[in-house]
Amino acid sequence: MIENILDASAVLAVLLNEKGRDKVERILDQSAISRVNVTETLTKLVEKGATISDAKKAFDELKLKIIEFDENQSLKSAELRPLTKHLGLSLGDRCCLALAILENLPAVTADRNWANLNLCKIEVIR
């Protein structure tokens, strides 16, 4: 059963052995991620020097449930822009939040500025 929606920053904490990793590792088997945030995660790994093949392999080893991006998420992400613009949230951030809101689940992130949002339950890992 899915109990959390992970932001790319939370997944990267695990893959890059960053602070907060332990909190995310404990909930991996109860978490899902938006396809948009998968792209964001893989992009960051490639930017850090991984091949796309190695990045995908590392991500796949986490065995996360991936939720495909659909019209409802698209609309909610767009609707969130004016509510999050002042914090500089990216499209990926808004896609994660949109999915969490639509699924009525907590969003798990390493981005501390999300704590200032009152859109859904947010768990900051560090």
What annotation goes with each model-predicted range?
Residues M1-I33, L45-D60, R126:
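Short, well-structured N-terminal submotif of metal-dependent ribonuclease cores
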Residues R21, V38, I52, S74-S77:
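A general structural signal for well-ordered alpha-helical segments in protein cores
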Residues A10-V11, N37, Q73, C95-C96, ...:
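Alpha-helix capping/helix-boundary segments
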Residues I2-E3, L97, I101-R126:
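Acidic, PIN/NYN-like endoribonuclease modules and their adjacent C-terminal/linker elements
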Residues I67-V108:
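Active-site neighborhoods of divalent-metal-dependent phosphate/nucleic-acid chemistry enzymes
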Residues I66-F69, V124-R126:
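Short acidic-hydrophobic, aromatic-tinged amphipathic segments that line or gate anion-handling sites
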